[in-house]
């Protein structure tokens, strides 16, 4: 099983030093996208990620986050301005692809579906996590300096968007639960049912409880 965390920070420029269109935090959680693909182990496709050591199949979970930060700047002189963050929009996405060899047992398929279920479970509360993180940035005031205040403003908001998505990625902690699931099932090599292993792993390491 492999989880990917991708972050993109976007910036929308409006009139001079005024970047907010509507105040507040907006979280846009897109529906999860699922796909199942088969492959020939002797000739795996180029776009298939390498399987996790110990497994012949793969569940590839890609958590995407995109933060757009807006603020209002009050220029105090030619080279100084105070920026107040007044708008944050975070878009979340989860893409899951299960890769299985052409000849695979139902037990292995169920194991990979268990990985998918864990990712889906974490994604259920991902909007709440993103909301909490973004709320900490709302209302922040930062002084920018330089001869190109618009450029400084652009860099500030891009960095803040990147900081939000980085924090979201770090706080998800889904990988630790997935690793526990693999330990419980011995990478599908024992007879523990996937549904039982999923329940045990989520009970032992639920969202928000994993260690840093």
Where are these regions (language model features)?
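Signal peptide processing junction and immediate N-terminal pro/mature segment
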Residues: 18-19
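Catalytic Zn2+-binding segment of zinc metalloproteases
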Residues: 113-131
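Bacterial N-terminal signal peptides that target proteins for export
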Residues: 1-8
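Metalloprotease/metallohydrolase-associated module, dominated by Zn2+-dependent proteases
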Residues: 22-86, 90-92, 137-212
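N-terminal signal peptide c-region/cleavage motif recognized by signal peptidases
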Residues: 14-15
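Alpha-helical segments in soluble extracytoplasmic regions
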Residues: 85-101, 132
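Active-site alpha-helix of zinc metalloproteases
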Residues: 103-107, 116
